[in-house]
């Protein structure tokens, strides 16, 4: 059972997350020749002040 664990910053809509799950699942199924029903996707959302880019929190970088 292939599992993808994705970390994203807060702020995406449910529709965007559904699209992400669908497209990652399709890509994994295709590239690994695995039935899509066996693919799992886990999304972990983080507050922007919990993620650093270049030594600064993403919240300060307007990301």
Swiss-Prot record:
Record's keyword terms, sorted: Aromatic hydrocarbons catabolism, Isomerase, Plasmid
Active site: 2 (proton acceptor)
GO BP annotations listed: salicylic acid catabolic process
A Pfam family per the record: Tautomerase
Keyword Cytoplasm included in the entry's annotation: no
Pathway this chain belongs to: Aromatic compound metabolism; salicylate degradation
EC number(s) given by UniProt: 5.3.2.6
Matching InterPro entries: 4-OT (IPR018191), 4-OT-like_dom (IPR004370), Tautomerase/MIF_sf (IPR014347)
Protein name: 2-hydroxymuconate tautomerase
Homology family: Belongs to the 4-oxalocrotonate tautomerase family.
NCBIfam families (alphabetical): PRK02220.1, taut
Membrane spanning residue stretches: none
Presence of the UniProt keyword Transmembrane in the record: no
GO molecular function: isomerase activity
Cited PANTHER family: 2-HYDROXYMUCONATE TAUTOMERASE, TAUTOMERASE-RELATED
Role according to the record: Catalyzes the ketonization of 2-hydroxymuconate stereoselectively to yield 2-oxo-3-hexenedioate.
Reactions mediated catalytically: (2Z,4E)-2-hydroxyhexa-2,4-dienedioate = (3E)-2-oxohex-3-enedioate
UniProt subunit comment: Homohexamer.
Listed CDD domains: 4Oxalocrotonate_Tautomerase
